[in-house]
């Protein structure tokens, strides 16, 4: 469809929002982040790529209004206990706010999942990037809050869990 609305939570550099807006120019795309610095980078990137995206500062759903057909998020999902698994180049080049989350990496997912129903349209979909060990737990968590929805865990090219899709099936 060409007239969908999308919210990217935790947009960071804006890569997901910008790519989707390029692929679907008719979509209304909004993107939020907690970090002012990230939003400045995202806004500059959107300007460079001639995309019209509404950027705003928000902590998950605070400051969000309206309903969206699609909510996407690549939130911080690394457990602080798994810090040693993260490459040194990532640790030195990425803000830790963008990498690590409380509750063994599930804190931001939980906030999004608990609040998403209020901001999704009736046929709305959720898309998450996930850590390779998080598929089963997220499937269970999402199933609790969205028993009527289909929850799929998709694998990356290495056969590891990498994305969750929540839809009506």
Language-model-derived ranges and their functions:
Residues 1-73, 78-85:
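Conserved SAM/SAH cofactor-binding pocket of Class I
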Residues 16, 42, 74, 90, ...:
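Residue-level signal for inorganic ion chemistry
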Residues 54-56, 97, 152:
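Structural signal for short hydrophobic segments within the conserved structured cores
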Residues 61, 66, 157-159, 169:
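Short, solvent-exposed coil/turn elements at secondary-structure transition points
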Residues 74, 93, 129:
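Alpha/beta-hydrolase-fold catalytic nucleophile elbow
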Residues 77-108:
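Mobile active-site "lid"/loop adjacent to the S-adenosyl-L-methionine
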Residues 81, 168-169:
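Short loop segments at secondary-structure junctions
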Residues 103-167:
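Conserved Class I SAM-dependent methyltransferase catalytic core
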């Amino acid at each position: 469809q060409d007239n969908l609305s999308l919210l990217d939570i935790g947009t960071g550099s804006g890569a997901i929002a910008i790519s989707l807006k390029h692929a679907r120019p008719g979509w209304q795309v909004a993107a939020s982040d907690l970090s002012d610095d990230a939003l400045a980078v995202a806004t500059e990137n959107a300007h460079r790529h001639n995309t019209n995206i509404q950027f705003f500062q928000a902590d998950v759903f605070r400051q969000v209004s309206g309903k969206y057909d699609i909510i996407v998020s690549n939130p911080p999902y690394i457990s602080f206990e798994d810090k040693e698994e993260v490459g040194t180049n990532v640790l030195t080049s990425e803000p830790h706010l963008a990498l690590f989350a409380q509750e063994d990496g599930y804190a931001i997912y939980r906030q999004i999942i608990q609040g998403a129903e209020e901001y999704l349209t009736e046929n709305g979909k959720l898309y998450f990037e996930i850590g390779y060990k998080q598929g089963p737990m997220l499937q269970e968590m999402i199933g609790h809050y969205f028993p009527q929805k289909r929850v799929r865990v998709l694998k990356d090219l290495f056969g590891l869990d990498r994305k969750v899709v929540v839809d009506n099936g």
